[in-house]
Design a protein with these regions (language model features):
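Glycine/threonine-rich flexible loop motifs
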Residues: 100-109
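Short glycine-rich anion-binding loops that position phosphate/pyrophosphate groups of nucleotides
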Residues: 12, 40, 72, 97-100, ...
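C-terminal accessory domains and tails appended to enzymatic cores
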Residues: 158, 162-164, 168-257
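Short, glycine-/small-residue-rich phosphate/pyrophosphate-handling segment
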Residues: 126-153
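Hydrophobic/aromatic ligand-binding patch that stacks against planar heteroaromatic rings
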Residues: 114-118
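Short beta-strand segments
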Residues: 9, 35-37, 94-97, 128-129, ...
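A cross-family phosphate/adenosyl-ligand binding-site feature
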Residues: 2-6, 17-83, 87-88
Length: 257
């Protein structure tokens, strides 16, 4: 019986520690190919490259097929599916991101967007993120990955939903369990530090932190804060159903000549 094909990508770059660990675990379940950005591409969201050439380089690695892409995380998935792979992968895995992707900040996430591209092509996918810490300790993360990847390769895993998995930094000590959660309303509050270069031109460095505004344990960021692995099932139907239900019958948008 042939092994399933698994596409592995991220937004931190093909040489990051997170993607190495994710690929090592995934390779226990199938044949993996890494197609990832050539450098850090965090915050690129669902952006694609339209007006510049996209460079592609095969990385010399005896044990693993790796392609480095001079483009966004979504570029990586599109190029892999359209040009590099001979067959459709059974699963797309994105990560492990160095830092959480929770709340409204997932709209900025290249990690989540690379996984969510799969919805458009009907392939199951998971985005993995590990809470940031000083040392970025990945100890015991493989246990979580093994459990979830095994589940995802089940025939019943949906191909119109992305699992957004966030792992607390306490995973190397203790976790309280795995919890199915909803996307919260937490924001990433940015601070833009204004500076001057040697030629007196203005430039900025961005910094910031997640603002916690909820206490419901069924919310992604709150579950993480309480030591749970959070799995948020994401779909990308962005229509406000509540607004439609409340306003569609009013007729105030009717146009009469």
């Amino acid at each position: 019986m042939s092994r399933p094909l698994i596409l592995v990508t991220n937004d931190d770059g093909y040489s990051s520690k997170g993607i190495e660990i994710l690929n090592n675990v995934a390779s226990n379940f199938g044949d993996t190919i890494i197609v990832a950005p050539n450098s850090e591409k965090s915050g690129k969201a669902h952006g694609i490259t339209l007006y510049d050439p996209i460079g592609l380089k095969k990385i010399d690695n005896q044990n693993q097929l790796i392609y480095s892409v001079d483009g966004t995380p979504v570029d990586c998935v599109k190029i892999a599916i359209n040009s590099l792979l001979d067959k459709k992968p059974k699963l797309i895995l994105s990560g492990i991101n160095h830092g959480l992707n929770v709340g409204r900040s997932i709209l900025y996430s290249g990690t989540v967007s690379a996984a969510s591209e799969s919805i458009m092509i009907g392939i199951p996918s998971i985005a993995f993120s590990l809470q940031k810490s000083e040392e970025m300790d990945f100890t015991n993360v493989d246990i979580i990955l093994e459990k979830l990847i095994k589940n995802a390769l089940d025939e019943d895993f949906p191909n119109d939903v992305v699992w957004n998995v966030n792992i607390p930094k306490t995973v190397n000590e203790k976790i309280n369990g795995i919890k199915l959660t909803k996307q919260g309303k937490s924001n990433f509050n940015e601070i833009y530090h204004k500076r001057k270069d040697p030629r007196n031109n203005t430039y900025f460095w961005v910094d910031g932190a997640i603002e916690s505004i909820e206490e419901d344990l069924d919310v992604d960021e709150v579950a993480i804060r309480n030591g749970y692995v959070s799995i948020t099932p994401l779909s990308f139907e962005l229509t406000s159903q509540k607004y439609l239900e409340n306003n569609q019958s009013k007729g105030f948008f009717d146009f009469e000549k």
